[in-house]
Amino acid sequence: MVAWRAAGLNYVRYSQIAAQVVRQCTKGGANVKKPQATLKTTAWENGKMVSKSQ
């Protein structure tokens, strides 16, 4: 018999608890520095680069 069934849980409740634990383990704290997104664009005119922004 599987452990969650022996503990008196049904599969739905077991999966809810498991999902909650995974979310708690993977959640970053408020003080975790998040990487910044960068976007680079290049303007082209007649097949030649006109300007490049970073």
From Swiss-Prot:
Mitochondrial membrane ATP synthase (F(1)F(0) ATP synthase or Complex V) produces ATP from ADP in the presence of a proton gradient across the membrane which is generated by electron transport complexes of the respiratory chain. F-type ATPases consist of two structural domains, F(1) - containing the extramembraneous catalytic core, and F(0) - containing the membrane proton channel, linked together by a central stalk and a peripheral stalk. During catalysis, ATP synthesis in the catalytic domain of F(1) is coupled via a rotary mechanism of the central stalk subunits to proton translocation. It holds the Pfam family ATP-synt_Eps. Belongs to the eukaryotic ATPase epsilon family. InterPro entries: ATP_synth_F1_esu_mt (IPR006721), ATP_synth_F1_esu_sf_mt (IPR036742). GO terms for molecular function: proton-transporting ATP synthase activity, rotational mechanism. GO terms for cellular component: mitochondrial inner membrane; mitochondrion; proton-transporting ATP synthase complex. It is found in: Mitochondrion; Mitochondrion inner membrane. F-type ATPases have 2 components, CF(1) - the catalytic core - and CF(0) - the membrane proton channel. CF(1) has five subunits: alpha(3), beta(3), gamma(1), delta(1), epsilon(1). CF(0) seems to have nine subunits: a, b, c, d, e, f, g, F6 and 8 (or A6L). One of its GO terms (biological process) is proton motive force-driven mitochondrial ATP synthesis. Keywords: ATP synthesis, CF(1), Hydrogen ion transport, Ion transport, Membrane, Mitochondrion, Mitochondrion inner membrane, Transport. This is Putative ATP synthase subunit epsilon, mitochondrial.
